Amino acid sequence: KIPCKSAFGGIKKVLFADYGGITAVVVDSTTKEATITGTPTWYEYDVKGSSSLETSVTSSRENGTTFYTQTLNLTLTYLDAKTQSELQTLAVARPYIVVEDYYGNNFLCGFENGMECTGGTVVTGAAAGDLSGFTLTFEGMEETAPYFLDTAVSPDAAQIDPTA
């Protein structure tokens, strides 16, 4: 059955945690949603508009291999020193990333191998309407597509407010 044309794309928020804090992922055989165990600390960034998560599958009959490349393109629209400091740490780390879309779906990226920053920019813009902020690309190669989580993860209470 073809669904109605009411889809709404985009990412609402992105959460990062240190790699190694999740001890297991259990996938429900009926719902196919996953539950994570472990207690990583999650750091949240609210995003809107120009961030995206894309997963591509690469499969080779000749080699007998299949893997999924998870790519997060992240745009943060405010330039400040505290956020820059956190992003510099993320750029050299290999975090887990949870992406929440506008339907409330939470996707766990990088469970087996972590996600790695493959590039980005710190930009002031040239014109009044240009981006003044950060762009980062994170990529992970996994045996599965990102897991749909059965519940949202809770962010740490100490979050950066770039406008404060």
Residue spans for each PLM region:
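Solvent-exposed edge beta-strands and adjacent loop segments
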Residues: 1-73, 115-128
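Short, acidic/charged, Gly/Pro-enriched secondary-structure junctions
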Residues: 87-109
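Short, conserved charged micro-motifs
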Residues: 81-88, 147-149
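Oligomerization/assembly interface segments of phage tail-like spikes and tubes
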Residues: 60-82, 130-144
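Mixed-charge, glycine-accented linear interaction segment located at domain edges/termini
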Residues: 114-164
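Generic "edge-of-domain/loop-turn" microfeature
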Residues: 21, 41, 52, 79-81, ...
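Hydrophobic side chains in beta-strands
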Residues: 76, 99-101, 111, 140
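A general structural signal for short secondary-structure junctions and capping/turn motifs
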Residues: 64, 87-89, 98-99, 126-130
